[in-house]
Amino acid sequence: MKTTAAFLFFIAILFVGCEKDDFTTGIVGIVEYGHADCMPSPEGPKIAYDKYNGVLYFINKRAFENIGNGNLQELKETSIKTIIRNGELAIKLPVDTFLVIIEEVYHNTVDNTLIIEQGVILERDFKFWRCTSF
């Protein structure tokens, strides 16, 4: 009887420990990072993208707009951040508007502004890139 109880307890622990962290409000997608020669050309820059590996920041848009001459690095450190591996993004986020940036490059554009709504898992991909020459 003790063996059966111990076995059932062990199975219950395995089952609980293997549950996914499901969420109902947040974002999933793919993050890519690239580089390009930005010398002027009629075709524009040719960007070579790879799956991103690194830190992705979700900066509160209002806090960013009110930073003035403040320190962007301090704002990043107090923001929501996640580690991206092989480009895979899946994170629970609070309802708000965010500026999404990576460590290597900063862009403040509509393309990386994110509006999170209650009960919605947004599916969105991000492509960040930097110039290797001008």
Please give the residue ranges for each predicted region.
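Structured interaction patches on ligand/partner-binding surfaces of diverse proteins
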Residues: E104-F134
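Short, surface-exposed beta-strand/beta-hairpin micro-motifs centered on an aromatic residue
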Residues: S79, R85-L93
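A short, amphipathic beta-strand motif
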Residues: T25-G34
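C-terminal motif of bacterial Sec signal peptides marking the signal peptidase cleavage site
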Residues: L14-G17
